[in-house]
């Protein structure tokens, strides 16, 4: 009668809360480890193009791409609106990836 939701053994799921002064936002990560690897490689390439001479629009586009890669389009946009500063978004996304998500992706790939 009811179909069980099939969960890929390579899926990555997480919940993360970000704080900014007196505000908080909770975002959810759900996706396939392999697709994260591909998306994060593209994000890394975009991040490497940012220099001190990059204009604000380039920084915003890069930060938005990184956030969308990690959290999906809607939640990535919410994170951009939450911080309203591209370098802050790049920083928190980088810290989250380094501290938690990379370990979850590696674990999912070993299954």
Question: Where are each of the predicted segments found?
Answer:
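Short, charged/polar N-terminal "headpieces" of proteins
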Residues: 1-46, 108-111
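Short, surface-exposed, charged amphipathic helix/loop patches that serve as local interaction elements
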Residues: 33-111
């Amino acid at each position: 009668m009811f179909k069980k939701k099939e969960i890929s053994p390579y899926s990555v799921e997480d919940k993360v809360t970000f704080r900014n002064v007196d505000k908080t936002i909770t975002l959810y990560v759900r996706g396939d480890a392999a697709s994260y690897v591909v998306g994060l490689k593209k994000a890394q390439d975009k991040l490497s193009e940012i220099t001190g001479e990059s204009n604000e629009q380039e920084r915003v586009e890069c930060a938005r791409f990184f956030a969308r890669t990690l959290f999906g389009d809607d939640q990535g946009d919410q994170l951009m609106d939450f911080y309203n500063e591209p370098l802050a978004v790049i920083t928190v996304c980088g810290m989250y990836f380094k501290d938690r998500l990379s370990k979850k992706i590696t674990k999912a790939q070993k299954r």
